[in-house]
Regions:
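Bacterial N-terminal signal peptides that target proteins for export
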Residues: 1-10
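Acidic/histidine-rich catalytic neighborhood of metal-dependent amide-processing enzymes
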Residues: 124-125, 131-208
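Metal-dependent amide/peptide-bond hydrolase catalytic core
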Residues: 25, 195-205, 209-212, 216-469
Length: 469
């Protein structure tokens, strides 16, 4: 039987030593879980695809009923942000916990259960936002409620933000708050979305804490050629040239490159994976075997594959206006997610070589986010250590630092010196390919994950902000 590593023993000791406010012993967790499920379902039942006002009103009403002061800040009255603060003794800088209240849009016809019903079925809660991001939102709101009810003693203020506009319009949410109201949310550390607990077969295997993320770059491909009559097909057809260019770029395997975070991630992931997967992750570091490993990941684990390089996804194609007219121009919009240290001009030049067609122009897009990408967050900080210990205590699992392949609103805070860590509820690894993941037409979260996520947040927040006696 293998002996626990020194780090595992240290984490276990820290987990056992996490501060527990005296009043926390009085929490009736079965009763709290019932309340938590009601609040979680209520949040999912609010349509916040175009306006977060309904969520803001619910959160404000719920917190104020507990005696927690609430402030609404809005660039647009239909897109309010909620801010609440519980005061500590001031011996340490504040902790910020934030989640976004908006969701992506829906096509109701594609849902088995109505997207805003929060239907409980087969041990899952179904609905838009059930994962992204109302799982974090409810857990943070309930943590604030429990801190207030138990009169928890805090070494630092705990600031809660329910932000608007994360799904593509952060100018109404964190972009606005960071630019116009930063003193009201300034903190030493922040807990937000971006991570997850990974379950397989219903069993939690490991936790991922997002410590860095790719940044959006974007580009367009524009193909041009003579217009003409559709009855006389030409070799210069703009759509044909665009189609070839899109195929070449979509199936290209860009250069793989590790950073400290992804190297640690794959090394640790190999220790908690089944033998076949573990060998595949190890093969990524072997120049003679990495191509086969990458090919497997591209086919079967696109999210994992995307962590290896700057990725390109053709998502919009536009061209033509009439069936019998050869168009003179056709355009493809590319979603590019770049490694934090990617040299984009050089990468665009590589793309041009792959496309290899003078009829197709690559037009770089404007960088998304705020400023230059920042280095990875510390994995030796007290905050990160408490997160590791909390995952160990609640789930009995190890923690892997990870680089997100998508951007979050933490990009608005990290350049300002806030140490931001991305978290998430436990999700089934099998769900993504089955169409049950975030942004899917059957988005869902296991009921047990709802309860465990609240338990984790309670441990983490009291561990980071709780007073040491």
């Amino acid at each position: 039987m293998p002996h626990p590593s020194p780090r595992a023993l240290a984490l276990l000791a820290l987990a056992l030593a996490l501060p527990v406010p005296a009043a926390a012993q009085q929490i009736d967790w079965p009763k709290v879980n019932e309340e938590a499920m009601r609040n979680y379902q209520s949040l999912v039942q609010i349509d916040s695809t175009t306006s977060e006002a309904g969520v803001a009103a619910f959160v404000k009403r719920t917190l104020e009923a507990e005696g927690i002061p609430v402030t609404l800040l809005a660039k647009d009255p239909a897109r309010p942000n909620v801010i609440a603060r519980l005061k500590g003794n001031g011996s340490k800088k504040p902790l910020l916990i934030m989640a976004h209240s908006d969701t992506v849009k829906i096509d109701p016809a594609k849902w088995t259960f109505p997207p805003f019903s929060a239907t409980r079925n087969g041990g899952y809660v179904y609905g838009r936002g059930s994962i992204d991001d109302k799982s974090n939102l409810f857990a943070q709101m309930m943590t604030m409620i429990l801190l207030k009810r138990t009169n928890a003693k805090l070494d630092r203020d705990v600031i809660f933000v329910s932000e608007s506009g994360e799904e593509g319009a952060s100018t109404f949410g964190m972009g606005y708050l960071a630019a116009e109201h930063f003193p009201e949310i300034e903190a030493e550390a922040c807990l937000a979305e971006g991570g997850a607990v990974i379950r397989r077969g219903g069993v939690a295997k490991y936790a991922m804490v997002q410590v860095m993320e790719k940044h959006g770059a974007g580009a367009k491909l524009v193909a041009r050629g003579p217009s003409g009559h559709g009855s006389r097909p030409t070799q210069s057809n703009a759509i044909a040239h665009l189609g070839q260019a899109v195929a070449r770029i979509a199936f290209w395997d860009p250069p793989m490159r590790f950073n400290d975070t992804t190297r640690t991630y794959f090394e640790k992931l190999a220790t908690v994976s089944d033998p076949a997967d573990a060998q595949r992750f190890k093969d990524l570091f072997d120049p003679e075997k990495s191509a086969a490993a990458r090919h497997y990941l591209a086919e079967n684990e696109p999210g994992t594959y995307s962590m290896l390089h700057t990725s390109i996804s053709p998502n919009i194609i536009q061209g033509g206006f009439q069936a019998n007219v050869i168009p003179s121009e056709a355009t493809a919009t590319l979603d590019i997610r770049a490694l934090p240290d990617e040299d984009m001009p050089a990468f665009y030049d590589l793309m041009r070589k792959v496309i290899n067609d003078p009829a197709v122009e690559l037009v770089p897009g404007a960088p998304r986010g705020e400023g230059k990408p920042v280095p990875a967050m510390s994995t030796t900080s007290d905050t990160y250590k408490v997160l590791e210990a909390s995952f160990q205590k609640v789930y009995g699992i190890i923690t892997l630092p990870t680089m997100a392949t998508a951007a979050t609103d933490m990009t608005r805070l990290r350049p300002r010196g806030v140490q931001c860590y991305g978290l998430g509820a436990a999700r089934d690894d099998e769900d993504t390919l089955k169409g049950f993941g975030a942004h899917s037409d059957q988005e869902r979260l296991a009921e047990d994950s709802v309860y465990k996520h609240l338990a984790f947040y309670w441990q983490a927040v009291t561990g980071i902000a709780g007073a040491r006696f």
